[in-house]
Amino acid sequence: MVATDTVQLTDRQRSVRDAVGDICDEFDAAYWREHDAEGEYPHDFVNALAEEGWLGVLLPEEYGGKGYSTEEAVAMMYTIARSGAGFSGAQTVHAAIYNSAPLVNYGSEELKSDLLPRVASGDAWIQCFSLTEPKAGSESTAIETEAVRDGDEYVINGEKLWTSRIDVSDYLVLAARTTPREEVEKKTEGVSLFLVDIERGHEAGSLDLEEIDKTASGVVSSFRVTYDDLRVPADRLIGVEDEGFYQVLDGLNEERLVIAAETVGLGELAVEKGVDYANEREVFGRAIGQNQAIQHPLAAGHARLQAAKQFTFAAAKRTGDEDRKAVGAWANTAKYLAAEAAFEAADAAVQTHGGRGIDRAYDVERYLREARLTRLVPVTQELALNYLGENVLGLPRSY
């Protein structure tokens, strides 16, 4: 096994790693291979984590959560990805952890008291965040889905893309314009967040779902969703009307660090698979791993991943800093480094396997598909660099 225990963990991080790792050990490579091939959500895996309270890792203890911080979440999600679940396996849990954040920070006490304990126990899932639209991807302030107040309800109409896990979630967090863009002073104003009861939306005939056929993350289904006169009670508005965009930004850096940790775990998994195959496969009377042409790409991948890993875990310790731009710089750097390192590592693993690299039975083709995805989500590599160029290097804003 490739030595990757290169980060000095806190006692609590080690405890998280060991406890979560024990659960992950029950789900082998064949489990993830089969679920990816079938496009099947891993309910038993997620339920196993939920039973031990891990979906509430970041929820306050007063609501039944563990009350842990980003440091522990980074250790948890890295462990899941590294175990064999990969990036997509980690994503089956990731949303359950982070989509509750707006509710924790801005929701009414009545709503939090009612829902968060059920989220912490796994009895209710907020696995879905609906933001991206056909004409609003990276430019999220350009969303056109609108929510119009009608008495004690809001009526929501619009179309969203890449709304993932709506098929396995009880609730979703929806971003919609409550004030038209042309009527606000700043483009970041006029957006609000709502907690939507998915079953109620289906019963009213207000949700139309079309699944997106995609190449990566088969265990997580993504949809184009049309909201047609969806009625949401006014008390399901999260926080203050028109301030939803700022609520989304709050906690964004911490989430990117967790994404980086998941990505590093995926990359290490790919390197290990490549090394194992390089030691086992013999050509011309010797193991192919004896050749520098095989060794060097894997070694370079390992080196890049360890650098990204050190940066990510160090950045997780900085999330309490008051200087949010500094935290943003750490988070975007970690995300960028991890995605680049994981992709190069997965590509090297595929190349090491030769023709078998595209054989699903060897898993590395899945790792490559997932590693490519990490360069796109939750923010593109280019936007991460834009942030660094503007906020770290002091260059003019480019967009």
Q: PLM ranges: what are they?
A:
Residues 88-110, 137:
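N-terminal glycine-rich flavin-associated loop
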